[in-house]
Structures are given as C-alpha cells and as structure tokens.
C-alpha cells in the first residue's frame, strides 16, 4: 500500500504549551475570533502549579489585576479556587499592597481545562511539538520567502514528534521548563520538565537552527509532606484575613469558599548543621549544575550560606488543596539527596514525625534570552513566532499569564493584519516587565518587583481597571457586559470623590472629637471629608464608623476614592514625571557628558551610556541596561546642573 502523508490541519494561531502563559495566549486569540489550537504534553496538567500553589503577592498581584482588567482569566480562577487570602504589606502605602491567594492546585487546573474546552474557536491537542515550519529559513532550508521588516523567516506551522504538521499564520511558544528539562535530586538527574512529566525534545535545536541564542536557567521546588503527620497545634497559625477581597474586577464571578489556615515554623541549629555538612552533595555546591536560579526564591542551602549570620529562617506550611493532605513547605526548597531530605525536614519544629510525600528537586531548562524579542513578544528573526512565560527567562505564574495574554493578543492582531500592541512601561507592570525583558541582558530568572517600577504609586492593583480596561475594550478583549460594569464603577467612584470634596464636618458635630483624637489635629470651624482623609491615620473605615461613608458602597469604590484623595499630590507629581519624560525624549544630551560621575545612575547605566554616547534621551532609552529609573535620574541631574549654572551666572552679575 503506497505511503500517503497525513492530512494537514490549518489554524490561524497555534500555542505550544498548556501552562499559565499558554492558556492565556490561547484564550485571548480564540476570543478575538481566531481559530486557535493549544498543544500540550499532558491535558491532565493544564495550568498546573508545580511549585507554590498560590497566586499574587508583591507586584505579582498587580500583574494579576492587570491581566483581569484586559479580559484574562488568572484572577478569576484564583478567586474561585482560593483556600486562603491575605493582604501583604497592609501597614505600608497602597503602592505596595498585595493580595495573595493560596489556591487549590487541582481544582484550578480542572477549572482552566473546562474553560478551554468551552471556548469557541479553540481546539486542544495532546502532542509534543518538536519542530517549526518556516519560509525563508536562515539556515538555508524551507520555502523561499522575501524578508520584510528585518525578519529572516516567516512561521508557517509546527511539526510534532510523530511527524504530523499543523499549519498556522502565528505560533506562540510557551514551553515553561520543558525544553531540555532536567530534574535534579542531589547529584542524580533525569530528563523531565517537572516531576513525573517528560521533557520536550527538538524545539531548542529548531530555534538554534533558525539563529536564535538559547541558554540554561534553574528553578526548584520544596518537598511535600503529609498534613496528618505534622503537629500543627504546636505551630503558629496564619489564618486568612482577606476573604472579601478579589483579584477580578468582575463581581459576578466572585466566590468565597471556606478558608484554610497556613502555619509557620522555623529552621533550627540542627537544620543548619545538617546542610553545612552536606553542601557538596547539592547540584550547585557540588558543581553538578551551574545554571542560574531565581535570586528572590533561594534554596534553603543558599539562605544559610548567604545569610550566615542568621540563626533561623521562617518556613510556611501551606495546603495544596481541600481534598489532599499534601502540604507545601514554602521557603525550604533544597538540592540535597532524597535520603537526607526527610532528616532535614524533621529538624523543623512540628515536623519531627513528618512523612515526606514528594522530595524537593531542582530543574534546569533551556530558555530564549528575551532581547531577541520585540515589545510585542514577537521574535525579531521569525515573523509570526511569539514566545511567552519561562521560555523568556521569567519565573512565576503571574509573569507567565501576563506575557501569554500579550503574545496571544499580538499573534491574533498579526493574523488580522493589525498593528502590534506595545504596553508602555509607565502604564502597567505588564509594560515594566516586558521592557525589562527585551531591553536588559538578564542571566537569572526574572521576577516582577514593585521596586522595578518608577511609577508604582500610579501602577496600583486597585486602579488596574482604570488604567487598562478602556484599552481592553478598544482591542476587543472586554465584552459589553464587562464594559458596562466598568463604566458603572467609574461613575460611582467619581460621584463619591465629589461628595467627599463637598461634604463638610463641623467642629461641633458629634463625630468631631473622635476624629480629632484619631489625627491629633483640631477641626477649626469645619473641614471637608476629603481634607479629613488627607490627614495621616484617617481612612474610609473611620468615616464609616461615624456614618460619614455608606458601608454598602463597594470596597473598590471606597478605597479608590480614598487613595485618589489621600495621595493626590504624589499622584500628580508622578504623572508629571511621566509626562516630562515623554516630552524630553528628543532632548539632546551634551557630547562631553561624564556619565561615570553621575552617582544616581546605576553602575550598568554609567558603563553603557559612556560606551554608546547617545545623542538624545530617545537614543538613551533604547540602550539595553539603561532603565527608565536611570533616565529619570539623568533628567533630574541635568535639571540640577542647569539650575546651578543659572544661579552661578546670576551671582556673577
């Protein structure tokens, strides 16, 4: 019987990888009307949380709010599957407030799979993609194609391990830790993308054959222990404190299930001694592995080596679900051999008799340095090829989801022949992250941080809808129902702000003495509620207590009005800085400027600016390693020099 090639399926967009980036990318493209296929190695592990089963935290929660404001799904799934919610940094300013939810990892995965299966235009395929089909392959293969806009080739589809070819005009790679994945326990290793799942073959070589540079990164996850074997009654309990708060701006999706507590223990002298005696058995300290791991999520051995002066480290015991006894030992990832891990766990108070269900392990994997991407997350070498998530060198479900949405959006717009969307740094943490990724030569897993943004007071979680939902509606990501909800909320917010600016409280009013005591300042005659809120220590909750704010008013409206009023001066100044930086983009820089002596610039920026010698701010902003914070510092320095020069010339006269 003569051989016949299998029929080729055609899609508009193909997404490779079913993690948090891949799911957001596929859902976004499908909702924009594109026929979309999502390929994954295991349909039973869709949107899996292989490390910490949690969503949110500092800067990460802002990302989740932003993804939701643009129509993404990570926020509402985190809300629906939350086991516990807490507000972090609550004692600090609103720029760094962060919602964090402990989630039921299996329920989260099931709900995401159901959502994908119910989405029109979206097909799911379980297969290993090992190759890329292109026209104009720089290596000399493929069909002839005339290069355009700097691209050396154009994507036409993907090829699977068993030889099937699927055609598409755009392909989004979201392969996580699976490209060349190798997991390590002590000095033992095996090919795997994560424990129990095979690594992906072929794609790294396919990318390299197209001229892409690849490298290796590392991450790790701690052991899981049986809850029933832990003496929880001996440990500090950490209950939920934010069951009434949500990531999603859509109140019709809010679900508050029964909350579960986490618990806290600490390392001991025995913990530290056992680690110090066996450091050479770990992949990093033993020299078996040299890939860079995440700076902000170090292993327990890294903590003990780097912070040798600390005699104890806090460890959190977090549930993985309502229907499983598995406990995630946060802050205790390790590269020690499995035979030592149980002994190590049993040095922790409350875990003296614990049962280890899964050992800790490290995983190193191939990634694509993101300087090879444009801000749309399309690769510079191959038109129609996009990448997102850990493949771009990031760490975290939230970072992955945000990139997935951007890549899916721009893949869809490419197919439609529409202009690519770039998210400016000053408009969102999404923009901040992507700007960092594509402009900086990063050699360790990237995590979003509030300190990475120069505009964090403006880029808060509570106002993510105000910043991004109008754009989402314009792009077709937000439907009419969500748009109506948004408009109603904004009307209520503006009405409340106006009321607070107009309504006054007199010194003779019954509530005045208590409010004066709260602030330590007298009310002279009368004062508007807005000016009262501007006083330190006064919050909308205090006004509710005295009948000055409607307790039935939505929390988002109450807090939004309070923040806008209380921080109005700071917000105006930060917006002025943003506007000034935009205006200054064409400002010329002196040819003889000595960047080495500008101490407010980062060391990297001083070196890069000296080497390049940009003519203006626009050129300076394109130099990898020169951040927007550096540009702001340079602008301030130039203004100070200008004032000093003017002052000196005036004095001379």
Swiss-Prot record:
Gene label: mnmG
NCBIfam families linked: mnmG_gidA (TIGR00136)
Name of the protein described by the UniProt record: tRNA uridine 5-carboxymethylaminomethyl modification enzyme MnmG
Binding site for FAD: 17-22
Chief place where the protein resides: cytoplasm
Complex formation: Homodimer. Heterotetramer of two MnmE and two MnmG subunits.
Entry's family note: Belongs to the MnmG family.
Taxonomic lineage of the native organism: Bacteria, Bacillati, Cyanobacteriota, Cyanophyceae, Synechococcales
Cellular component GO terms, alphabetical: cytoplasm
Function of the molecule: NAD-binding protein involved in the addition of a carboxymethylaminomethyl (cmnm) group at the wobble position (U34) of certain tRNAs, forming tRNA-cmnm(5)s(2)U34.
Keywords for this protein: Cytoplasm, FAD, Flavoprotein, NAD, tRNA processing
Keyword Nucleotidyltransferase carried by entry: no
GO biological process: tRNA methylation; tRNA wobble uridine modification
Cofactor: FAD
Places the protein is found: Cytoplasm
Binding-site residues, NAD(+): 293-307
Any one GO MF annotation of this record: flavin adenine dinucleotide binding
SMART domains per UniProt: GIDA_assoc_3
Organism: Prochlorococcus marinus (strain MIT 9303)
Entries under PROSITE patterns matching the protein: GIDA_1 (PS01280), GIDA_2 (PS01281)
């Amino acid at each position: 019987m003569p051989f016949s090639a299998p029929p080729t399926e055609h899609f508009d967009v193909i997404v490779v990888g079913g993690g948090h980036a891949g799911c957001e990318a596929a859902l976004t493209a499908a909702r924009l009307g594109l026929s979309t296929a999502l390929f994954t190695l295991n349909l039973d592990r869709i949107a899996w949380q292989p490390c910490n089963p949690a969503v949110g935290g500092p800067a990460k929660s802002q990302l989740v709010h932003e993804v939701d404001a643009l129509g993404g799904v990570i926020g509402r799934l985190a809300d629906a599957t939350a086991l516990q919610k807490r507000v972090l940094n609550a004692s600090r300013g609103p720029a760094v407030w962060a919602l964090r939810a402990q989630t039921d990892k299996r329920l989260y995965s099931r709900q995401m799979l159901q959502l994908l299966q119910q989405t029109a235009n979206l097909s799911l395929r379980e297969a290993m993609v090992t190759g890329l089909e292109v026209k104009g392959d720089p290596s000399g293969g493929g069909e002839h194609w005339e290069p355009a806009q700097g691209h050396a080739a154009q994507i036409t589809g993907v090829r699977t391990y068993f030889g099937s070819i699927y055609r598409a005009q755009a392909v989004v790679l979201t392969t996580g830790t699976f490209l060349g994945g190798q997991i390590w326990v002590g000095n033992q290793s095996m090919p795997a993308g994560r424990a129990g799942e095979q690594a992906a073959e072929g794609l790294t070589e396919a990318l390299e054959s197209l001229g892409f540079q690849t490298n290796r990164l590392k991450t790790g996850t701690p052991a899981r222990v049986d809850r029933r074997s832990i003496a929880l009654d001996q440990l500090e309990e950490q209950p939920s404190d934010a069951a009434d708060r949500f990531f999603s701006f859509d109140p019709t999706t809010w679900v508050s299930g029964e909350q579960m507590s986490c618990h806290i223990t600490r390392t001991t002298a025995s913990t530290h001694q056992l680690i110090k005696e066996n450091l050479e058995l770990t992949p990093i300290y033993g020299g078996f592995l040299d890939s860079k791991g995440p700076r902000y999520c170090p292993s327990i051995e890294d903590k003990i080596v780097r912070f040798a002066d600390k005699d104890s480290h806090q460890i959190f015991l977090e549930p993985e679900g309502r229907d499983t006894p598995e406990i995630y030992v946060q802050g205790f990832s390790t590269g020690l051999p499995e035979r030592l891990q149980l002994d190590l766990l049993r040095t922790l108070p409350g875990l003296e008799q614990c049962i280890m269900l899964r050992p800790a392990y490290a995983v190193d994997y191939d990634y694509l340095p993101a300087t090879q991407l444009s801000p749309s997350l399309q690769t510079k070498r191959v038109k129609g090829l996009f990448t997102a998530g850990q493949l771009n060198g990031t760490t975290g479900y939230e970072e992955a989801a945000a990139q997935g949405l951007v890549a899916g959006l721009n893949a869809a717009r490419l197919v439609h022949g529409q202009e690519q969307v770039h998210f400016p740094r000053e408009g969102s943490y999404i923009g901040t992250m992507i700007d960092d990724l594509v402009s900086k030569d990063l050699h360790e897993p990237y995590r979003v941080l509030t300190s990475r943004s120069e505009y964090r007071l403006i880029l808060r979680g509570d106002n993510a809808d105000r910043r991004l939902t109008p754009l989402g509606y314009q792009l077709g990501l937000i439907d009419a129902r969500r748009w109506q909800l948004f408009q109603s909320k904004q009307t209520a917010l503006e009405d409340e702000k106006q009321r607070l600016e107009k309504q006054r409280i007199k010194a003779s009013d019954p509530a005045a003495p208590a409010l004066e005591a709260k602030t330590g300042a007298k009310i002279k005659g009368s004062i508007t509620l807005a000016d009262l809120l501007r006083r330190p220590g006064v919050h909308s909750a205090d006004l509710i207590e005295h009948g000055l704010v409607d307790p039935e008013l939505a929390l988002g409206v109450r807090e939004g009005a309070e923040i806008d009023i209380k921080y109005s001066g700071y917000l105006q100044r930060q917006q002025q800085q943003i506007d000034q930086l935009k205006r200054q983009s064409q400002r010329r820089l002196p040819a003889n400027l000595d960047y080495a002596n500008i101490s407010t610039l980062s060391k990297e920026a001083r070196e890069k600016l000296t080497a390049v010698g940009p003519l203006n701010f626009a050129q300076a902003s394109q130099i990898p390693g020169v951040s927007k914070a550096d540009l702001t510092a340079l602008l301030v320095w130039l203004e100070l020099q200008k004032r000093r020069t003017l002052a000196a010339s005036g004095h001379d006269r």
